[in-house]
Amino acid sequence: MRTSWKLDHESLIGYGYTVKVIREIRTFIEAEVIKNGERTEIQWGADSAFRFFPLCEDEITGFTLHPIDLAANKLSALVGRTEPRDWIDVIESIKNIQPLVYLLSAACGKDPGFSPTSMLEYIARRRYNQLEIDECIIPAGVYNAAELCCFWREEVCRAREDVLDFPRDKAGTCVLNKDGEPFRGSVKELSVAVNTGDVIFHEGRICGAWPKII
């Protein structure tokens, strides 16, 4: 992580960006990057070697975590950290990756001290007002707090019902369809997919692995 930070920092400076370190600890660096009046925040972190998928190669950022691993990490962060960014990232993951109940299962695979139900009750309390969101999201006004809170409340209510029907012995796995893509159906549809063999409960491991498609 330190090597990546050093190289990225030098590259950004070389391209005329101003880099302001916001927070720095041994395994994590957060910096604000500014140029021509525009700014964004970038984070460098040292992640656990345990994950569901191998690292994904990206033309811009080099290597990144698979979206499901990122979403699982954000859920774990939301349990113990009060950052509006984490909450918004989880909401975006629900919208773009898969329903909350499946992301909870994956997150518990990385943090076995939780079950989907117990983790849900921790994160269900999270909500932020417009001022809190605008302070950490640049530019301000990108997200509407009222809309986010309504969406979050609905998803938490849905997940509370879903965890009751989710297979307990599969908690901690990543739920994929038969093609190895994130499963996005309802829990009732999951039950049907289990019976027809159209779902994969993919387990995490050191350095991750791609699911076996049969």
What residue spans do the PLM features occupy?
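Compositionally biased terminal segments of proteins
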Residues: M1-I214
